[in-house]
Curated annotation (Swiss-Prot):
Belongs to the RecR family. Residues 84-179 form the Toprim domain. A zinc finger (C4-type) spans 61-76. It comes from Bordetella parapertussis (strain 12822 / ATCC BAA-587 / NCTC 13253). The lineage of its organism: Bacteria, Pseudomonadati, Pseudomonadota, Betaproteobacteria, Burkholderiales. This is Recombination protein RecR. Pfam families: RecR_C, RecR_HhH, RecR_ZnF, Toprim_4. NCBIfam families: recR.
Length: 202
């Protein structure tokens, strides 16, 4: 006996589409679908139109690879940004986090991923040649590698760091330290050790 009640094809299609979101399993997708259809039809319509509009009108910036409606995004076109600094991040979300710190006024390049051999993602899939060409435009003086401190992020930073250093660019890496406001007993030993080694006078 089939334990799953039969569902209409449009509902199945919606659930499968929602499952494509990161961290969303079939149960969560089904709950979201039921909620939208039962309690928020207006929201469902807004979501559909917004997603369709984003797919149709957004593209990758010719300079930084982030999302934009125009050929060059507003950040890259901003004359107040420092063109000599280029910060390389994995995703637009990472870019937004760095921007929200208000401590960086240079430009960005968004990889839209990281090297992940088990997922079949390597330098070619991330178009590293384009990254290198962007960094070697004759204006950039320093490249800041701001990939995540995961195994994949470290591999990505190492690969890019070697490639860019060979071309005479100054390459730096985001420092890892004890997060502001945290208590040392709750910070892992590796982070504390690294923070001690990288300590500097204040």
């Amino acid at each position: 006996m089939d334990p799953q009640l039969p569902e209409p094809e449009p509902l199945i299609a919606l659930i499968e589409a929602l499952r494509r979101l990161p961290g969303v399993g079939v149960r969560s997708a089904r709950r979201m679908a039921y909620h939208l259809l039962q309690h928020d039809l207006q929201g469902a319509d807004m979501l559909g139109r917004a997603l369709s509009g984003a797919v149709q009108h957004l593209r990758h910036c010719a300079r930084c690879n982030s999302f934009t409606e125009d050929e060059v995004c507003a950040t890259c076109a901003n004359p107040k940004r420092d063109p000599g600094l280029l910060c390389i991040v994995e995703t637009p979300a990472d870019q937004n986090m760095i921007e929200s710190s208000h401590g960086y006024r240079g430009l960005y390049y968004v990889l839209m991923g990281r090297i992940a051999p088990l997922e079949g993602v390597g330098p070619r899939e991330l178009d590293f040649q384009r990254v290198i060409e962007r960094a070697c435009d004759g204006v950039v003086q320093e490249v800041i590698l701001a990939t995540n401190f995961t195994a994949e992020g470290e591999t990505t930073a190492h690969f890019l760091g070697d490639a860019l250093s060979e071309r005479g660019l100054k390459v730096t890496r985001l420092a890892r330290g004890v997060p502001a406001g945290s208590e040392l007993e709750y910070v892992d030993a590796g982070t504390i050790a690294w923070a001690l080694m990288e300590r500097r006078s204040t």
